[in-house]
Regions:
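Short, flexible coil/turn micro-motifs enriched in small/turn-prone residues
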Residues: 21, 40-41, 60
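Generic cytosolic/nucleocytoplasmic N-terminal low-complexity/intrinsically disordered segments
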Residues: 2, 60-63
Length: 70
């Protein structure tokens, strides 16, 4: 599986859209590392589109793995 990497401008736009808060637990960026996550994982048919990306803190993203969000 390829490692997801995105343009810095898209990453910034997603961080702004999600108010730099983890979409799962609500943690804010100043307290923990944030990552851009695919809501529907690429391995499950998700796409590399803005609407399929969200901000998750590192712990939530690790727990989510390749499962669907929610």
């Amino acid at each position: 599986m390829r490692k997801f990497s995105t343009n810095i401008h898209i990453r910034i736009a997603i961080l702004r859209r999600d108010r730099q808060e983890c979409r799962h637990c609500g943690e804010i960026a100043k307290n923990v590392s944030m990552e851009i996550d695919h809501i529907i994982p690429l391995s499950r048919g998700g796409r590399d589109v803005f609407s399929n990306l969200q901000v998750l803190c590192r712990p939530c993203n690790r727990r989510k793995g390749n499962r669907f969000a929610g």
